[in-house]
Structure formats: C-alpha cells, structure tokens
Design a protein with these regions (language model features):
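Conserved catalytic cores of phosphodiester-cleaving nucleases, focusing on short active-site segments
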Residues: 20-53, 69
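Short amphipathic alpha-helical face segments that pack within enzyme cores
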Residues: 64-72
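Metal-dependent nuclease catalytic regions and adjoining charged, substrate-binding loops involved
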Residues: 59, 71-158
Length: 158
C-alpha cells in the first residue's frame, strides 16, 4: 500500500551545488521508495523514442537528471528502490514507463563532485558537448550572460 506521495518535491544537494524538483516520489508501507520523472512529449517524439524506427543513440540527459534527484531522494529517505521516467504522449494520452538503472546514481554523483572540484578553482572554460552538453541547457544557467558576452557564438554558429 502507498504510505506517502510527494509531488514537485524540492531536491537540494548542497555539497554538489545542485537543486531541482522531483516530479513524483512514492513511499510504500514497507518503507520502499520509488522516484518518477514525468516527461510530456508529442506523438512524433514518442515515435522517435519508442517506435519501430526509434533513435539509435538516444540522449541520456533525462536519465542523468532523474539520477540527480535520485541521489537526493536516497539521502532523504535512506533508500531508493527504483526510479523511472514516465513518458506521457500528450497527443494520445499513452504513458510508457522506462526503468532507469540504479548505477546512474554513482555516475551523476561522481560527475557533480568533479564539477564542484573544477569550479572551486574558478569558472571553467566552455567545452562544447561537455559543458554544456546541449545548447538548451544554457537557458537555465546563471552564467548565460557571461557566455553570451564571451565566445559562445563560436560554439553555436550563431
């Protein structure tokens, strides 16, 4: 049975300098804890992800985002028994659950520890396809104006 449901739960990993919001955390009566991130996509994106001609090398950034939240959930509850991405096709209302391997927790924790270490030495230079991995990430970055005034244009061909 479900004991508690948490929606849009704040996640703050002070030591890793990471903050976000977990879409859905479900805690069961037996103490087990499950984390879900809901991704709303259109029919075309859904076909590209799950159809016969799906992408050969899909991006893992959504898995890694969920894993960051997973680190926070595990710290808060003392355990995390599973984490999944829920893809909601907004055109058909179909939902598909994709379980994410728990090893991603180790991957993201190591990654963010390395980032904190690197930033402790000063603001690092941009590295295309590394930091940022995707151009859309810049919209959420506090240093966007620095990059815009710096040499960002040479990376994006703007």
């Amino acid at each position: 049975m479900i004991k508690n449901v948490y929606i849009e739960e704040p996640i703050f990993l002070e030591d890793l300098k990471v903050r976000g919001f977990a879409d859905l955390i479900i805690e069961l009566d037996d103490g087990s804890v499950y984390l879900y991130d809901i991704k709303t996509i259109n029919a075309w994106s859904y076909r590209m992800k799950f159809g016969r001609n799906k992408e050969k090398d899909p991006s893992i950034h959504q898995e890694l985002q969920l894993a960051v939240y997973g680190v926070g959930v595990k710290r808060r509850f003392g355990r995390l028994d599973g984490m999944s991405l829920l893809y909601y096709n907004k055109d058909t209302s179909v939902i598909k659950e994709v379980d994410i391997d728990m090893s991603r927790l180790i991957t993201v924790e190591s990654y963010w520890k390395e980032i904190v270490k690197e930033h402790s030495l000063g603001l690092p230079n941009l590295r295309p396809n590394v930091s940022p991995v995707n151009d859309w990430e810049c919209r959420y970055c506090l240093y966007k104006t620095r990059c815009d005034n710096d040499n960002r244009k040479e990376f994006t061909n703007e």
